[in-house]
């Protein structure tokens, strides 16, 4: 209702919250790094959708990135710090909580994607209910190019959206596609010229905000039942495989070669 006190998101460092009526916009924010996911953002992503669910001042959530990027995926410097310090990569419990809290959010969540949505960035966008992308946006899940498994949800959501054959090709090559091509093959709902993206998302969010909220929410919840069951059947294994590959020589070589701007020399990795 109008005037309700919303959840205070000011304590978040890597996610910025803004409000427009009953629409809550969450913007990934890692300035200078194309909103890459570092330890702080990963931790915050594991709880921000729970806070959004509890927010009484919003009915619709928009997920986007600050500036000209949605998210470039995992921060390679964070990965390098991980293997140099002997840790096994991102926290597995956090990784699972990100996916499940997205799926458990009853409010419709709309992705607004400009620029790159890569790796976990793509996963976040694709688990949203409706995805708007700039025609020039880029989607990819190049975990394999970092020597790791696409375990954070990509192996779940890509096949559901575009079928197993296409999804496996993109997951085992890491190849990128444009927003226009993503819409053509059904990976996203809508691709629009970049200068029309904000207005398109605002209009759609306002349309949902003016609808029957209980009916909208429970229709979404019902549609998500099968997807949640699938996620529960896959995510433990896929995250586990990813954690294993964070310890490999191939992963270390992938990260170092990228930071050193050279071609990686992979071993067999098994």
Which positions does each model-derived feature cover?
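Crotonase-fold acyl-CoA enzyme core
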Residues: 100-216, 243, 247-248, 252-256, ...
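Conserved CoA-thioester-binding segment of acyl-CoA-metabolizing enzymes
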Residues: 1-66, 100
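C-terminal alpha-helix plus adjacent terminal tail
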Residues: 1-24, 55, 70, 174-180, ...
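Hydrophobic alpha-helical membrane-association signature
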Residues: 41-44, 94, 197, 238
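Glycine- (often His-adjacent) and acidic-residue-rich active-site loop
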Residues: 9, 47, 65-104, 117, ...
């Amino acid at each position: 209702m109008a005037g309700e006190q919303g959840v205070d998101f000011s304590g978040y460092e890597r996610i910025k919250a803004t409000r427009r009526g009953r629409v809550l916009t969450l913007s990934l924010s890692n300035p200078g790094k194309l909103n890459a996911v570092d330890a702080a953002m990963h931790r915050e992503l594991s709880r921000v959708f729970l806070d959004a669910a509890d927010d009484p001042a919003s009915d619709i959530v928009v997920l986007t990135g600050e500036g000209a990027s949605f998210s470039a995926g995992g921060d390679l410097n964070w990965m390098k710090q991980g293997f140099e310090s002997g840790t096994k990569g991102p926290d597995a419990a956090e990784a699972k909580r990100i996916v499940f809290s997205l799926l458990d959010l009853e409010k419709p969540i709309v992705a607004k994607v400009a620029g790159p949505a890569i790796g976990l960035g793509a996963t976040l966008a694709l688990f949203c209910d409706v995805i708007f992308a700039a025609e020039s946006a880029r989607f990819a899940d190049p975990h394999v190019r970092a020597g790791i498994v696409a375990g954070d949800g990509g192996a779940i959501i890509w096949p559901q959206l575009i079928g197993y054959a296409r999804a496996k090709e993109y997951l085992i090559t890491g190849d990128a596609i444009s927003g226009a091509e993503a819409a053509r093959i059904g990976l996203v709902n809508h691709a629009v010229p970049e200068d029309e993206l904000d207005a398109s998302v605002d209009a759609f969010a306002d349309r949902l905000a003016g609808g029957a909220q209980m009916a909208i929410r429970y229709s979404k919840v019902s549609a998500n039942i099968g997807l949640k069951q699938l996620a529960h059947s896959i995510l433990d294994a896929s995250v586990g495989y990813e954690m294993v590959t964070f310890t490999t020589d191939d992963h270390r070589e992938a990260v170092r070669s990228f930071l050193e701007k050279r071609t990686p020399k992979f071993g067999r990795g098994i």
